[in-house]
A protein has these predicted regions:
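Charged, low-complexity, helix/coiled-coil-prone segments
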Residues: 1-3, 43-61, 94-111
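Residues within well-ordered alpha-helical secondary structure of globular protein domains
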Residues: 30, 53-56, 113, 124
Length: 179
């Protein structure tokens, strides 16, 4: 088909994901602190927490698991304290410190930095590269995952939480992601 990338490329995935990234960052860009604090229920995460969680999870999976990118990308999402009882600080991210809500600018930048990392990987990797295995030791044992699983997991995670953000915005009469 004309205009289609070669079969050995991940650019089809990268293109669709880039579109979702753009929809998300445009939806967040001009939100006020009050709008970023909107949530569906008191016990649910606010818009800023969902977006921060998305960005931090990207850094966690691509850096900590796959060894991609500079440590500064991962460190961007670390916090000095958490408001979540019994959550170890090394496992905490932006979303876990409700005393420090993130701004639209911080969220858009965090999503941009992590998207740049993901996009560079997708442009470099081939489908065969997705079969590589990665193992991490944690306090509860070892876990092994395939690179392709990580790509899929982070993509589905983005779509899921992006949908939550879109729904929250729409429920409050704000423009949702224009999917």
């Amino acid at each position: 088909m004309p205009g289609m990338p070669p079969v050995d490329s991940l650019s089809i995935i990268a293109g669709g994901w880039a579109n979702h990234q753009g929809l998300l960052t445009r939806a967040l860009h001009d939100l006020t602190p009050e709008q970023l604090g909107l949530r569906t229920a008191p016990q649910q995460w606010a818009v800023w927490q969902l977006a921060g969680h998305m960005a931090g999870s990207r850094a966690y999976w691509f850096h900590d698991w796959l060894g991609e990118g500079d440590a500064s990308v991962r460190d961007l999402f670390r916090v000095e304290q958490t408001t979540v009882p019994d959550l170890p600080l090394e496992d905490a991210g932006w979303e876990d410190d409700e005393d420090r809500p993130r701004t639209a600018s911080e969220l858009v930048e965090g999503l941009a930095v992590t998207w740049d990392l993901i996009h560079a990987c997708l442009m470099r990797w081939t489908p065969d590269d997705l079969t590589a295995n990665f193992t991490r030791r944690r306090s509860n044992g070892e876990r092994t995952v395939e690179r392709g699983w990580v790509v899929w997991h982070v993509l589905e995670h983005d779509i899921h939480h992006g949908g939550e953000i879109s729904q929250i915005l729409g429920c409050y009469g704000l423009p949702p992601l224009d999917v």
